[in-house]
Amino acid sequence: DGKIKNEYKQADFIKLSVKKLNELGLRDKTKTKLTVPEIRSGGSLNVKNIEFKFNGIDEGLFFKNISFEMGKIYGIVGKNGKGKSTLLRCLVGCERKSKDEIYLDGKRLSKADRIKISSLVMQDVNHQLFTDSVIGEVGLGIKNAEIDYVEDILKKLDLYELKDCHPMSLSGGQKQRVVIASILCKDSKLLFFDEPTSGMDFYNMMNISNLINECKTNNNIIFIVSHDQEFLNSIADYIIYL
């Protein structure tokens, strides 16, 4: 039922301001420069050591003595193949080949310990859809008393009208928002997002940004891998460059 509301010649479209583009649900045409400060030490998640070697080569990930503060959002950026997604898996505890020593509030956490307190949104969200309805997926493990909160999240992500649909029947962007919604409803100490805004327009990108910010508390830490500099500028407290 879509309809054409405006038509622009190329020369006129190029002249549109960022504000006007955003009003149309479009992104900034220019390359955004990250303006948040780099990571600094101090916090309650302490990475004493992470070692991970890629198959067949000596290159890999090597981190020592890095601290992350509770109540902060960390953006992770770098070129393709630098190990951004691998770093997330190492921190979560689901990368079996990694050697690590990680502490939370002074207590050493095993891989199994970290998995229990972590939530992860992967790039391919098809691996994270398990139920036969959107509301069932987002509310999985949520008490009935909190169903109003689940429905509120669905409304904010334009998913409420799809709440009875099977998740696998949705578009790629809708599936992505379903998984993000399910993660935001969980009370995890460590939240990990791998390219959560890929392919999203400005409107949905800002919805995701606002919701993640709302979920930031003094009792959790959020890590976001993204090539979306506009998104990271809107949300990240610190940036990790790989």
Describe each PLM feature range:
Residues 77-79:
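The feature captures the beta-strand-to-loop junction immediately N-terminal to the Walker
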Residues 92:
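Helix-to-loop junction immediately C-terminal to a conserved catalytic motif
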Residues 147-162:
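Conserved ABC ATPase "signature" region
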Residues 201:
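ABC-family nucleotide-binding domains
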Residues 191-194:
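Catalytic Walker B motif of ABC-type/P-loop ATPase nucleotide-binding domains
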